[in-house]
Amino acid sequence: MTTRQRLSAERSQQLTRLLTITKTANMRALMEASELAKVIALVAVDIGKSDEMARAFPVLWPKISPQQEYYATAVDWFTNPDETVTSFDVVDMLDAGTSLDQDFMTYLKCLTELHKRRRKYGLILQRQPLPTMVQVSPRALMEYGPDFPPEALASWLTWRKFFYDLDNRSAQETGYLFEPILAAAIGGEAKSARERVVRRTDDPTKGRQVDCWKVLPDGTPLAYELKLRVTIAASGQGRFGEELSFARDCSSSGAKPILVVLDPTENDKLTGLQAAYREVGGAAYVGDAAWAHLEDEAGATMASFIERYVRVPVASVSSFERVIEGDATKRSLILQDLQARLDGNELTISLGGHQRLVERHEDQSLAADGDDDSE
């Protein structure tokens, strides 16, 4: 590698974005250059270009070459620093990867975003404070009595709220991750309401947020609504009205609306939503058809990303839920026994015969609700 004193402004900005795990007011974290280099190496392996990268970087490659696929690799392998790997090495790898596959950078962007969200959630597991009695003790009125003595009820209320907080954080991180990586994978990008690529029919001065905006080679603009599922909860009636009007707003703005729902579970809301899209010349894809559409639009390289990093994990976990007697509204899941233990700073979570240890270092600033990290 040629010795260099500084990166170009463009490369510096690109590297900063890739290395930044989180930069919220409550939490800041960066990757080391060696950690990013290992993610880049994983991309090369995934797309079948590991031999080319090994030849291009004979000294560097043995230090960063993964021995297993991403989900089978412990986070410690990524975070174990190697100071001999520099930012200039990373830039050289980016240049080499880009020359090997036109979708290399898109694949890297998506995998890096997934990795950073997982790393951030790992920090949340370590730092999320246990709830205080001020927060949970009023809830004792629902269960105070003979079943749990006060000391047991105090623990039950605390564990329950703690797990709720962790689940809420997980849902936040998944939400911030899901739409951007799918949008990037199919060659589009998210658009904010301020950009007004889709305007509200009843007030054209206001825009609509678009999960994925993509313009076809023939100039046809597509406006995607990407959803994990469509729920039937009554509390979502107002939001559902917004979802129904999205298709009409797209059509009046000259864009073709496309609905993609990964969960195949049918309900009246989903049926109505599909009809709203099709009535204005749009399209709707649900379940297997949704996955197939995403992979068709993504092309071979990014389709493999969607399959490996999104579809397989979701399907693998979902497979343990069983539909009863062919009725999709009736489902069963045999839960493994749960045990939780907090000993000093060590949290142990056991499920059946499986165990996870988390070294805890609470950060009280994370006790506040919300931690918008939608950068």
Swiss-Prot record:
GO MF term set: type II site-specific deoxyribonuclease activity
Key word Hydrolase present: yes
This protein's record includes keyword Nuclease: yes
Enzyme Commission designation: 3.1.21.4
Keywords of the record: Endonuclease, Hydrolase, Nuclease, Restriction system
Reactions catalysed: Endonucleolytic cleavage of DNA to give specific double-stranded fragments with terminal 5'-phosphates
Protein name: Type II restriction enzyme ApaLI
Record gene name: apaLIR
